[in-house]
């Protein structure tokens, strides 16, 4: 898909739809293509804030610490935020985003252990638009 491997952009607009609720977030991150920021698996940081990620899915939940945002986060979240119940990021059990590593949950929210709003497995439909 040429929009993945050959289209430069200044920002991403990501949308997450659960049921009839669709919410959006703007991610300022200029790059030569989405392929260039994801395919090599290298971690690339951006920040839109924990609260913005939580606002994408009503009732979503994250652990309180770590809060790494970006591309190719810890444990294979392609675009999103990972959180942990410990101050380090070595064993995160929660995420909101796209390309999540859990079977049947590639976009959405998962949280286990010490979650802000209880354990979650929320499957979502994701949109990634480039500008």
Residue positions per predicted region:
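Mature extracellular or lumenal effector domains of secreted proteins
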Residues: 1-131
């Amino acid at each position: 898909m040429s929009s993945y491997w050959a289209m430069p952009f200044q920002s991403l607009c990501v949308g997450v739809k659960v049921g009839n609720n669709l919410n959006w977030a703007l991610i300022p991150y200029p790059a030569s293509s989405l392929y260039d920021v994801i395919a090599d698996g290298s971690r690339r940081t951006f920040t839109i804030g924990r609260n913005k990620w939580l606002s994408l899915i009503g009732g979503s939940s994250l652990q309180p610490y770590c809060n790494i945002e970006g591309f190719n986060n810890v444990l294979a979240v392609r675009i999103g935020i990972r959180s942990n119940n410990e101050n380090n990021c070595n064993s995160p059990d929660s995420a909101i985003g796209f390309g999540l590593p859990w079977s049947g949950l590639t976009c959405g929210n998962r949280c286990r252990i010490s979650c802000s709003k209880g354990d979650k497995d929320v499957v979502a439909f994701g949109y990634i638009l480039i500008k």
